[in-house]
Curated annotation (Swiss-Prot):
Pathway: Cofactor biosynthesis; (R)-pantothenate biosynthesis; (R)-pantoate from 3-methyl-2-oxobutanoate: step 1/2. The keyword Transferase applies. The active site is at E181. One of its GO terms (biological process) is pantothenate biosynthetic process. It comes from Vibrio cholerae serotype O1 (strain ATCC 39315 / El Tor Inaba N16961). Belongs to the PanB family. Its cofactor is Mg(2+). Homodecamer; pentamer of dimers. This is 3-methyl-2-oxobutanoate hydroxymethyltransferase. Catalyzes the reversible reaction in which hydroxymethyl group from 5,10-methylenetetrahydrofolate is transferred onto alpha-ketoisovalerate to form ketopantoate. It is found in: Cytoplasm. The keyword Manganese does not apply. Transmembrane segments: none annotated. The lineage of its organism: Bacteria, Pseudomonadati, Pseudomonadota, Gammaproteobacteria, Vibrionales. 3-methyl-2-oxobutanoate binds at D45, S46, D84, K112.
Length: 264
């Protein structure tokens, strides 16, 4: 696989070419994903739940993400590698810059932060200092205590309109990717069509430019709850490599997510 950059994703958006992405946490799986030409990987703070056994992502630290970012980069030298900025690691723009630098030094090409237009100054400061940003909207797991649980976001018209405004503001501030989680497909389609930058969805229908799954959900090995929008591709194929290939193929064709894995 050739080296993937944000320019490739922008080109694919313009061409209408959909792309698959996945979380990854170690060199072995990163190498497997690269062998199947997975273009984008995310070292997610989901590692707190799927690796560390926590009930949410809040205990994850910058050092945790940096460690796993180094591991993934060694296994996949050519992917576009995103790294989550954990809870309270970007409370101020200055703090965000300091912590983002640690993740870039660990091998990340881009950092992902959760939140709306209150992050505009942070996104501007990061991009001005050569740190690309993915803005995460919708269900932002670090806000679980504010939301009162993991709930679909953007069903009410005023909240949907607010999410559109947030997406535009973050793009204007310099965000190069927007990730939408657990939002109605119609809203995700609207945001995808309005934005110039690529939009990646999870639980947001198949109208986004890309899709992402937590790798443990893709293989059906999550310890507890399996979200409605996830699919066990290993059960369908019986082989890990074939499962990854099938996921990539189904995203590219628009077969995944289908209605059974879409939030209305």
């Amino acid at each position: 696989m050739k080296k993937i950059t944000i320019n490739d994703l922008m080109k694919w958006k313009q061409e209408g070419r959909k792309f698959a992405t996945s979380t990854a946490y170690d060199a072995s799986f990163a190498q497997l994903f690269e062998s199947q030409e997975m273009p984008v990987l995310l070292v997610g703070d989901s590692l707190g739940m799927v690796l560390q056994g926590e009930t949410d992502t809040l205990p994850v630290t910058v050092d945790d993400i940096a460690y796993h970012t180094r591991c993934v980069r060694k296994g996949s030298p050519n992917c576009l590698l995103m790294a989550d900025m954990p809870f309270m690691s970007y409370a101020t723009p200055e703090q965000a810059c300091e912590n983002a630098a640690k993740l870039v030094r660990a091998g990340a090409n881009m950092v992902k932060i959760e939140g709306g237009d209150w992050l505009v100054d942070t996104v501007k400061m990061l991009t001005e200092r050569a740190v690309p940003v993915c803005a995460h909207l919708g269900l932002t797991p670090q806000s679980v205590n504010i939301f009162g649980g993991y709930k679909v976001q953007g069903r009410e018209q005023d909240k949907a309109d607010r999410m559109v405004r947030d997406a535009l503001a973050l793009q204007e501030a310099g965000a190069q990717i927007v990730l939408l989680e657990c939002v109605p497909a119609e809203l995700a389609n609207r945001i995808t069509q309005i934005l110039d930058v690529p939009v990646i969805g999870i639980g947001a229908g198949n109208g986004t430019d890309g899709q992402i799954l937590v790798m443990h959900d893709m293989f059906g090995i999550s310890a507890n709850y399996m979200p409605k929008f996830s699919k066990n591709f290993l059960a369908e194929t019986g082989d890990i490599r074939q499962a990854v290939a099938k996921y990539i193929e189904d995203v590219a064709s628009g077969a995944f997510p289908d209605l059974a894995h879409t939030i209305a």
